[in-house]
């Protein structure tokens, strides 16, 4: 999670698909574990079980209490089968998730520390996410994450993912 200060009601959940440097970010208000589970359920509902499994085979996170619903995150509500694996990094070892740390660094350009994010809307955050999709990335030979995503998957899946 990316928050600004502890008094904020809003939090930004950030995910990245590392092979494509493809970020997804979601604005959440006072999120609990069930809200994180619902976020993953919404993605699976929009893109389907097989696409979810291909896109997110592994979710690597810190030990944030909002990721404690392990079965809710890893088991499909659609099929009842495992949709992904969930692993937790060791405490204070950010080097275990460098792609997430890099994404959070990029997000800080839009959402600086010590600046409240409580007045943001989901639409504001979606615009930031889409701008990250079309920004060339060095590790992708200056292609964009959207280019990489649509080449590997499809434009149709890209649009479904952003619903």
Regions found by a protein language model. Give the residues of each.
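Short, structured coil segments at secondary-structure junctions
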Residues: 80-82
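Short conserved beta-strand segments at catalytic cores or DNA/RNA-binding microdomains
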Residues: 1-24, 28-29, 40
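Short acidic, Gly/Ser-rich segments with clustered Asp/Glu that frequently serve as metal-coordination loops
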Residues: 4-6, 64-69
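An acidic- and aromatic-residue-enriched active-site/binding cleft used to recognize and process polar
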Residues: 18, 31, 64, 91
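C-terminal domain-tail junction helix/linker
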Residues: 71-72, 113-163
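Active-site beta-loop-alpha junctions of metal-dependent nucleic acid enzymes
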Residues: 25-50
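Short, surface-exposed connector motifs at secondary-structure boundaries
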Residues: 20-24, 50-57
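RNase H-like two-metal-ion nuclease catalytic core shared by retroviral integrases
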Residues: 61-63, 70-73, 86-109, 118-130
